[in-house]
Amino acid sequence: MGSEILVGIGEFRVAKGAVLKTIGLGSCVGIALYDPKLRLGGLAHVMLPQSGNGTKRSAKYADHAVEMMTEAMERLGSDRKRIVAKMAGGAQIFKHMTMDMLRIGDRNAEAIRTILRDYGIRIVSEDLGGDEGRTVYFFTNDGRMLVKYSRGGELWI
């Protein structure tokens, strides 16, 4: 296992031979991209489904995060055709809020699915929804993702 790199809210990181970690995924979604040939991976902590017109480019938005992470991986020699994705998060932390506008977790997940499809990137596994926060560890040496739940328990995806 390589060094651990923390990915903050609204940030992304790309690395080889490291463990990328993001904490506090409630309605936010952690998107991991992986190139198995290069053993190169990236992780973003996305807060919102899409940016508005004229919004500064930031990984806190799903549309920008996928674009920025893909570009960073391609600069390091990755081919988009080889990249696969994993996602975790998108919880409905406040179950009593049912208005669609407040269902940020669902909206984040759907936006990411659409963007990845547009980029031709296949989602190979996901752990989305529910009502529990998550911490994600993404192992760039082999593409595995460990999801730890805020109330205990874990899942490898």
From Swiss-Prot:
Keyword vocabulary terms for this entry: Chemotaxis, Hydrolase
Broad enzyme group: hydrolase
Disulfide cysteine pairs (residue numbers): none
GO molecular function: protein-glutamine glutaminase activity
GO BP annotations, alphabetical order: chemotaxis
Function: Probably deamidates glutamine residues to glutamate on methyl-accepting chemotaxis receptors (MCPs), playing an important role in chemotaxis.
Protein name: Probable chemoreceptor glutamine deamidase CheD
Organism of derivation: Archaeoglobus fulgidus (strain ATCC 49558 / DSM 4304 / JCM 9628 / NBRC 100126 / VC-16)
Taxonomic lineage: Archaea, Methanobacteriati, Methanobacteriota, Archaeoglobi, Archaeoglobales
